[in-house]
A protein has these predicted regions:
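A short, N-terminal "cap"/entry segment at the start of jelly-roll beta-barrel domains
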Residues: 1-25, 105-113
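Conserved short histidine dyad/triad with adjacent acidic residue
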Residues: 29-43
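Short beta-strand segments in beta-sandwich/barrel cores
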Residues: 38-39, 55-60, 74
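Glycine- and acidic-residue-biased ligand/ion/polar-headgroup-sensing regions
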Residues: 46-57, 62
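A cytosolic small-molecule/anion-sensing beta-strand core signal
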Residues: 53-54, 69-70, 88
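Structural motif
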Residues: 56-58, 65, 81, 91
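Short acidic-glycine-tyrosine-enriched beta hairpin
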Residues: 63-78
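Ligand-binding loop in jelly-roll beta-barrel domains
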Residues: 78-102
Length: 113
């Protein structure tokens, strides 16, 4: 999917991500999610905008389920708990602010391995 020199990182079974670029205040990645995969509830300090490039998934926030399909986007404020259920294979472009330094550290370790 991405021509980025960064490695693909397996996040969970059926979910992997790849850093596209980062800057002083923003970070962008692409995620591939297989149908039936699940990202458990979590939260992070970063604001997040996700744009579904292909496929369909369900974003779960505050107990509510929101289906999001190719061509649609969603916004998550800082520290909002959320989870994801993947309905069909999906590719998602995620942008975070500030950058995901935790993801960048994993990228650096993978490159040096």
């Amino acid at each position: 999917m991405s021509n980025s020199p960064n490695p693909w990182i397996d996040m969970r079974p059926g979910i992997r991500r790849k850093t596209i670029t980062t800057g002083a205040t923003m970070y962008q990645m692409v995620a591939e999610l297989k149908a039936g995969s699940h990202l458990p509830e979590h939260h992070h300090e970063q604001e997040q905008i996700s744009h579904v490039l292909s496929g369909r998934l369900v974003m779960i926030t505050g107990g509510a389920r929101h289906e999001v399909a190719a061509g649609e986007s969603f916004y998550l404020a800082s520290n909002v708990p959320h989870a994801v259920d993947t309905i069909e294979d999906a590719v998602v472009l995620d942008t975070f602010s500030p950058p995901r330094t935790d993801y960048l550290a994993v990228d650096a370790a993978a490159k040096s391995a």
